[in-house]
Regions:
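Short hydrophobic alpha-helices and adjacent helix-cap/hinge residues
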Residues: 1-205
Length: 205
């Protein structure tokens, strides 16, 4: 967990903050790790059970409650839609952030198992999936070079904070290299998108 996040949430605890509302698993974990019992309300995070934020859906326990978008579960459907929209596609680079997964409480084995699950789905459609690890914005040039070197004919963006920050870079890459990119949110401006609208799932009022 990033030290800066822990410091922020420890300061919140000391100032008597009543509740924390967040849209990321990383922040939710930071609140829990900072100690205390500040309630955490989440919206649009990935599977809270798999990342260890709750004990079960029926009886979550602890201090975390809210909504999940199960974004990882949508990846197989995204692969299927990508193939339907671009029939000639044969090799997809999956832009993921293993470090984001670790900060959200996932073990390396869980991250690897998730990729293998996606790969299996891709193989059933006659596709090859290439892991494209982007843990920081500075990793983008190397990732873009890998897409070209591996001759991937499509890029699938996992719903990570890093890919959200790099959305303009991905659109520019897509235009310059003529390689279709699929995101999880249409606001990114990629050729394709499939996923929940963050504006619709965010709290209002």
């Amino acid at each position: 967990m990033a030290g800066s996040e822990l410091i922020v949430f420890k300061e919140m605890r000391e100032k008597g903050v009543d509740v924390v509302v967040t849209g990321t698993s990383t922040a939710a974990h930071a609140v829990v790790e900072a100690g205390g019992n500040i309630p955490v309300v989440t919206f649009g995070i990935n599977d809270p059970l798999r990342t260890g934020l709750v004990a079960s859906f029926a009886h979550p326990g602890g201090q975390v409650t809210g909504m999940s978008n199960f974004a990882g579960d949508l990846v197989p459907k995204r692969i299927e839609l990508f193939k339907a929209a671009v029939p000639a596609i044969s090799k997809i680079a999956l832009a993921r952030c293993p470090e984001c997964g670790r900060q959200s409480g996932l073990s390396k084995s869980s991250i690897d198992a998730a990729f293998e699950n996606y790969s299996e789905n891709a193989r059933s459609l006659g596709l090859t999936l290439i892991p494209l690890d982007i843990d920081a914005a500075t990793d983008f040039p190397a990732a873009a070079a890998l897409v070209k070197r591996e001759q991937a004919d499509g890029v699938l963006l996992m719903p990570t904070q890093i890919n959200a920050k790099l959305r303009d870079d991905w659109v520019a890459f897509e235009t310059a290299q003529r390689v279709p990119v699929m995101g999880d949110y249409r606001g990114y401006g990629c050729l394709l998108s499939f996923g929940p609208d963050p504006a619709e799932r965010a709290p209002s009022g």
